[in-house]
Amino acid sequence: MAEYDHYEDNGFNSFNDSSQEEHQDFLQFSKVFLPCMYLVVFVCGLVGNSLVLVISIFYHKLQSLTDVFLVNLPLADLVFVCTLPFWAYAGIHEWIFGQVMCKTLLGIYTINFYTSMLILTCITVDRFIVVVKATKAYNQQAKKMTWGKVICLLIWVISLLVSLPQIIYGNVFNLDKLICGYHDEEISTVVLATQMTLGFFLPLLAMIVCYSVIIKTLLHAGGFQKHRSLKIIFLVMAVFLLTQTPFNLVKLIRSTHWEYYAMTSFHYTIIVTEAIAYLRACLNPVLYAFVSLKFRKNFWKLVKDIGCLPYLGVSHQWKSSEDNSKTFSASHNVEATSMFQL
C-alpha cells in the first residue's frame, strides 16, 4: 500500500505555487511508478510463490523443520502479493472498494507481512541449530517437525493479534481523493513501532547473531559445501539489507517529523524504497527454495508432468537429472544437516 498516502497533505498544504507544482509532479510520478511496481511484484510473486507451494505440497515430503517453514513462507507472500492489485488501482484512481474491503485488505496485507518476517526469523534460527548443533538436530527431527507446526500456528495467531489496530482503525477517508488507511497519530505510532520491531529489527538481529556463528562454524569446515553455503548466507543478508533497510530508515525519519520530511524529494524516497522493500515477496522463493537441489529436481518433475519439457528443449537435462538420482539419494543424509539442504 502507498505509505505516503496517509501523510501527503501534511508536507504540502502550506507551500507556495512552486511547491504545489512539484507536488503535482510527484503525484503523477507516484500514479505511474507505484502501480507498475505493485503489478511487477504481484506477477513475479504470484508465479514464484505458487510454484513453491505446489512443489512443496505435491512433490516434496515434509522431512525437516525448514520444509514446514517453506510451506508457510510462500503462502504468506502469496496472499500478501494478491492484495497489491487493489492498492495499484487505488494508487492510479482512488479507493472504490468500500470500508469493509478496506479493513479486510489492510488486515490481510498486515497479517501476511508479519507472518513472512517472523517465518524468515524462524528459518534463520533453524539453520543455526541445524549447522551448529548438527547431530542433536538430526536426532530430534520428528520432535522438531511437531514443534514447527505449532510455531507456524503461533506465528499466524501473533500476526493476527498485532494486526488488529490496522483492522479496527482502518477506514476510508478523503485527502483530495478517497484513501484506505488509518489517519490517527497514536495508531500510526503503534503500527510503526510494531512494524519496525517484528518486521525489521527482530529478523535483522536473528540474522546477525545466527549467521555470524554459522559462518564461524563453516569456516572450520571444508570443501565445496562450505563455500556454497557461505555464498548463500551473504546473498540472503545482502538482499535483506538492501531491500528492507532503506524503507525502514525512511519510516524512522518520517516518524521524527524532521523538516526534511516536508521536502518533495523525501516523498519520492518513500515510494521508491517502499517498492524496493516489496521485492522480498519475489525474491524469497529464489533465496529459500530454488537454491535447494531437491527443490530444483522436483521443479523439473513438475515441468515434465505438465508436458512442457519438449517445448523448453530440456529433455536432455531432465534425462541427465534422472541419471544422477542415485548420487542425489546417496548424499541425502549429508544434506539433511547442511546449511540449506542444497
Swiss-Prot record:
Disulfide bonds join 102-180. It is a multi-pass membrane protein. One of its GO terms (biological process) is positive regulation of cytosolic calcium ion concentration. InterPro entries: CCR1-9-like (IPR050119), Chemokine_CXCR6 (IPR002235), Chemokine_rcpt (IPR000355), GPCR_Rhodpsn (IPR000276), GPCR_Rhodpsn_7TM (IPR017452). Keywords: Cell membrane, Disulfide bond, G-protein coupled receptor, Glycoprotein, Membrane, Receptor, Transducer, Transmembrane, Transmembrane helix. GO terms for cellular component: external side of plasma membrane. One of its GO terms (molecular function) is C-C chemokine receptor activity. The keyword Transmembrane applies. Glycans are attached at residue 16. The keyword Glycoprotein applies. It holds the Pfam family 7tm_1. Its main location: membrane. Residues 1-32, 90-103, 165-187, 260-275 are extracellular. Gene3D superfamilies: Rhodopsin 7-helix transmembrane proteins. The chain crosses the membrane at residues 33-59, 69-89, 104-125, 144-164, 188-215, 232-259, 276-293. Residues 60-68, 126-143, 216-231, 294-342 are cytoplasmic. It is found in: Cell membrane. Belongs to the G-protein coupled receptor 1 family. Receptor for the C-X-C chemokine CXCL16. Used as a coreceptor by SIVs and by strains of HIV-2 and m-tropic HIV-1. This is C-X-C chemokine receptor type 6. It comes from Chlorocebus aethiops (Green monkey). The gene is CXCR6.
